Amino acid sequence: MGSQLFDNAPYLAALEVVLGLVREVRRRFGHTVAELNLGGGFGVTYTDEARPPYAYFLDPLMARLEAFCQDEGMTRPAVVIEPGRSIVAEAGLSLYTVGSIKDIRGVRKYVSVDGGMTDNIRPSLYGAVYRGLLANRAEEASTDTATICGKCCESGDILIRDARIPPARPGDLLAVFSTGAYGFSMASNYNSSPIPAVVLVKEGRSELIVRRQSYADLLATAVIPESLQCARDAH
């Protein structure tokens, strides 16, 4: 269907196409479809998007399907959806430590963090937009405008452009919201960066579910050819 959809019209239009195929298959071949996958793509909140409830998408779809099955005299197929991102995106956030700060007068202020495109490539890859705050100073007024940049040697390693935050200081904790989807799953070891840990948090309890990679992990699959070992031993 697509991604980040906030309107149910495309789903209803697609369902009509699918129901036409269900009808044709039944009449031409005598086969009744037992399962329909209605897809996913339900929108989530990254910044200020108003996220519709699942019922907004599914209630009209199910009503149309029920009416179709009644008209056709057939049992309603099992319905499958793919909620994916809409379940996990807002359930996750990324925590970074602020490092160096560079204020280019009249241009912009850069606040660097100890992560970036290696753990969340979406802003660099296709301009995804996120919201963040200084977690250790969340009650302070956001009087500063800064561009949050990563640690990679890439000018495009930007997490958030023109973020409104309190004046950042080295050591501050930056929280970036709605990174539960396509963050860890798209992480890489670019620039020989270890992938960070994943921690499950619920009701004041925290449990490690993916440990932080070490540099030893990055080298674990490296193999030194025998010819190079001989050259090394000779010296």
Question: What are these language model-derived features?
Answer:
Residues P60, M74-H235:
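Charged (often Lys/Glu-rich) extended helix/loop segments that serve as interaction or gating elements
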Residues M1-K102, I165, N191-S193, K202:
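Active-site loop/helix belt of alpha/beta enzymes
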